[in-house]
C-alpha cells in the first residue's frame, strides 16, 4: 500500500485484505462504535480528552491544542508512540484514523514519522467512514434483491445459513450477537447499534463479489429488533418484502435443535462435560450455568402476559424442575419438556400469525436438507 492517505470509498479494499486500523480516539469514543477491524490506541485517554474539551469550549482551539501537547508529553508521549510503533511492526499495512481525520490523527501520524515509521490516515476519519458505511446499507437495500429464510423457531434457520458454503449469506444473528427471540441473549454482550450497522455494511461490501447467477443473498427472517439492536429501516423493508425459503421440520426435531443451542452447547451443557478441569474452572462454569437458568426465568416472566398466566406457570414449573435436575443429578434432558411447551404455546402461534399477516411469497418449503438442495440448484 502506498503512503497516500486513504479515502472512505477504499474501505472495501481494507476489509478484503483484513488490514487493521488504528483508532486514536479516546476509549469512550471507541466504545460507542468503531470501524470494523479497528484497534483502540488513543492519543489521549478519556480524562485528558475531557480536559482538552473543556478548555476548547472556554478558551478556544489554540489553548486546547497547547493543553493537549502538555498532557501528552514526555514519558506519556513515548509510551503512546511506542504502542503505535509496536502495532505497525505487527501490522505493517495499518491505517490511522480519529473522529474527523483532523488534529489527532495528523499529530499521531507526525509523531510516528518522527519515530521512523510512516503510515497513512483515513481522510475524514470515523465520521466520514460512518457516513460511507451507512450509504452502502441504503444503496444495497434499494438495488439488491434478497431471499428471506423463514420457518418456525427451532427449524434450524441459522445453522442452515451457516452451512451454505460458497453462497452469499448475511448472518444477522452473528452480527447482533443475539438469536432474535425473547430467550435469544448470547452469553456475551450485544454490540452497540453503531458497531452493528458498521459490521453489516462491511458484510455487504464483502458479499458483492459472491453474488452471481440466480442466487440472491440469503438472510434470516428477523424482526425489526434483534435483542436491543434495531435493523436499518431500508434494509428491514427489503428483507420483509423478499420471497421466502420456508424451512419446515417436525416438532421433535425443532425441540432437539433448541435444546442443543440453548442447553447442550451453552454454559449449562459445558459445565457437565467430562473434560478434566481445575476446581476453580468448574465453579466458574457452574455459576455461569446458574446465571443462564436465571436469565431463562426472567425471559419467561417477560412474556408471561402474552403466554397466558396458567401456561406461564406451567412452563416455569417445568423450567425450575429441569434446573433442579441439573443441580441434583447432572441431568439435562428434562429441559426438553419446557422447550416443547414454549414452542407450542408461544413461538408457533406468534410466528405463523406474523407470516399470515405479511402474505409472503414462498419460493420453497421443505426440511433443511431439502432447502439446501434447492439453494444449490440456483447457483
Curated annotation (Swiss-Prot):
InterPro entries in alphabetical order: P-loop_NTPase, Rhodanese-like_dom, Rhodanese-like_dom_sf, SelU
Reactions it catalyzes: 5-methylaminomethyl-2-thiouridine(34) in tRNA + selenophosphate + (2E)-geranyl diphosphate + H2O + H(+) = 5-methylaminomethyl-2-selenouridine(34) in tRNA + (2E)-thiogeraniol + phosphate + diphosphate; 5-methylaminomethyl-2-thiouridine(34) in tRNA + (2E)-geranyl diphosphate = 5-methylaminomethyl-S-(2E)-geranyl-thiouridine(34) in tRNA + diphosphate; 5-methylaminomethyl-S-(2E)-geranyl-thiouridine(34) in tRNA + selenophosphate + H(+) = 5-methylaminomethyl-2-(Se-phospho)selenouridine(34) in tRNA + (2E)-thiogeraniol; 5-methylaminomethyl-2-(Se-phospho)selenouridine(34) in tRNA + H2O = 5-methylaminomethyl-2-selenouridine(34) in tRNA + phosphate
Domain Rhodanese: 15-138
Domain of life of the native organism: Bacteria
SUPFAM superfamilies: P-loop containing nucleoside triphosphate hydrolases (SSF52540), Rhodanese/Cell cycle control phosphatase (SSF52821)
Gene Ontology molecular function, alphabetical: tRNA 2-selenouridine synthase activity
UniProt cross-references to HAMAP family, sorted A to Z: tRNA_sel_U_synth
UniProt name for this protein: tRNA 2-selenouridine synthase
Protein species of origin: Bdellovibrio bacteriovorus (strain ATCC 15356 / DSM 50701 / NCIMB 9529 / HD100)
Gene: selU
